[in-house]
Amino acid sequence: MATELKEYLVIIPDLPDVLAKRQVLLKPHNQDAAPLVKAGRVPFFGSTLAHHSPEGQQVAENGTVMIIKAESEEEIREIIRKDIFTIEGVWDFGKLSIWPFKIARMRNRRDNSWVVQKFGGTSIGKFPDKTSSDMLCTKFRKESLRNNEQITADCQELLDYTSAAKRFNLDINGKAKDKMVSFGEKLSCRLMVAMLRDRDIPAEYVDLSDIVPSNNLDQLKPEFFHEAAAVFGKRVEACNGRVPVITGFFGTVPGSLIDSGIGRGYSDLCAVLVAIGLHAERVQIWKEVDGIFTADPREVPDARCLPSITPSEAAELTFYGSEVIHHLALSLAIQAKPPVSIFVKNVQKPWGQGTVVVPSDGDDTSSWPIDYLDPSDSDSTSSTALPKMPTAVTIKRDITIFNILSNKQSMSHGFFVKVFTILAEHDISVDLISTSEVHVSMAINSSNMEPSQIKNVQCRLSEEGEVNVLPDMAILSLVGAELKNMTGIAGRMFAILGEQHVNIEMISQGASEINISCVIPDKDATRALNMLHDELFTKSAI
């Protein structure tokens, strides 16, 4: 008679400092475990940033987490030593922790263990087409009659809205843009609710487009986000066990959601606000790429997916051209109590490693979410310390440089005040700046500026001095938390560009010391990006 196998949760801590440093590459788990995985003896094999025992004590800062089916704890230890790990010294077997899985599962989760998943419009557009043959069945076709009426009504409302705007020649202001943008997300959410219900998953459509109480604020303030998070959380909790399918568009936002300081990527912010309101464990940002890369893989074929990144690094990459995570979403997620962990995953490869945004050594981790990664969060377990390296390199295009030489009719502080007052009058933000007492160079994102607007700004600035405008430029940025500890990295970066005859118009290094940027001609941007990545990432990693 066969002995019944029991499920055990097993945690094997890594040796000190293996994962503590930023420069880490996670490799696929040991192939020796594959037969056991296929046989069902190891149904889950993943990695952990930190883990608590069922009694509440922290037992692992970093390491490997598994679910193993075995007759006893003694058999588990033999399985681990003989069948899974062949390299001694990477894992600390003396601190092996084993619990019956049912107990660990019940006691090691938060009481309110929400996970917020965000899918972009492109993902939603591809997902139904890819899976329709499996998900659309007879029941869906019957229920689709009612769903079709709702979608038709939404479409008709949008058509009426745009028709009225054309008929009466109405100006399309920020609020009108918000209204029109919201329809696409409403339609997508209704479709996803129908598809989930077809799979016998109870789902509820949640419309956040008018949920935030209207106020008289003209500008976004922290109080607005606190209020929005609380309102979102209450609305989602009202679903009472049904899966909420939420519109990424939300309102009413002071000024406008699209034209305010939020703009593109607002659905990232919405997901984080929902997570904060629910005290969720994590936010998963699902994209069409494997995670956050060392460079844009569309321009740099050798770019690698980063297993982890710090919030400050992610914010720098977002600001300087990489479409990573909305900067406000990052800021709010890290400032929340407890902070919300963020995972970036590939919607087409949900089993992939992805990238996790984790606090750096200098961040307060006392209230950071503590849990092991589930199978959808990681398929990697081992790590190898690497030499100090930058984290990523990125390009931000559509940059225009304004060089202003003071006419010396005012003191330097008065000169700068007048320059920035002119920019503020035209709602222009400066991406990079370099100054002296009588000279200032500014790199400005001109992607949304009309040529006439640039000309008007130039004319106004010419009142304060001689103005030289350089269009068609790009900001090349090297980002990494370890840059401040890499002596000579700036010189090496500029030497590489100089050797390839790439002209540098401006140089800037942030006060945080995690970013070195320069402005170069846009025509050289792709070449410069590949050269830096090849020298500082590909060759340095060999």
From Swiss-Prot:
It catalyses: L-aspartate + ATP = 4-phospho-L-aspartate + ADP. SUPFAM superfamilies: ACT-like (SSF55021), Carbamate kinase-like (SSF53633), Dimeric alpha+beta barrel (SSF54909). Fusaric acid is phytotoxic to plants such as cotton and banana. It has been shown to induce programmed cell death in plants. In addition to a mild toxicity to animals, fusaric acid exhibits acanthamoebicidal, antioomycete, and antimycobacterial activities. Disruption phenotype: Impairs the production of fusaric acid. Pathway: Mycotoxin biosynthesis. Its EC number is 2.7.2.4. InterPro entries: AceGlu_kinase-like_sf, ACT-like_dom_sf, ACT_Aspartokinase, ACT_dom, Asp/Glu/Uridylate_kinase, Asp_kinase, Aspartate_kinase_CS, Dimeric_a/b-barrel. Residues 404-472, 478-542 form the ACT domain. One of its GO terms (molecular function) is ATP binding. Pfam families: AA_kinase, ACT_9, YCII. GO terms for cellular component: cytosol. Keywords: ATP-binding, Kinase, Nucleotide-binding, Phosphoprotein, Repeat, Transferase. It is an enzyme of class 2 (transferase). GO terms for biological process: homoserine biosynthetic process; lysine biosynthetic process via diaminopimelate. Belongs to the aspartokinase family. Aspartate kinase; part of the gene cluster that mediates the biosynthesis of fusaric acid, a mycotoxin with low to moderate toxicity to animals and humans, but with high phytotoxic properties. L-aspartate is suggested as fusaric acid amino acid precursor that is activated and further processed to O-acetyl-L-homoserine by cluster enzymes aspartate kinase FUB3 and homoserine O-acetyltransferase FUB5, as well as enzymes of the primary metabolism. This is Aspartate kinase FUB3. It comes from Fusarium oxysporum f. sp. lycopersici (strain 4287 / CBS 123668 / FGSC 9935 / NRRL 34936) (Fusarium vascular wilt of tomato).
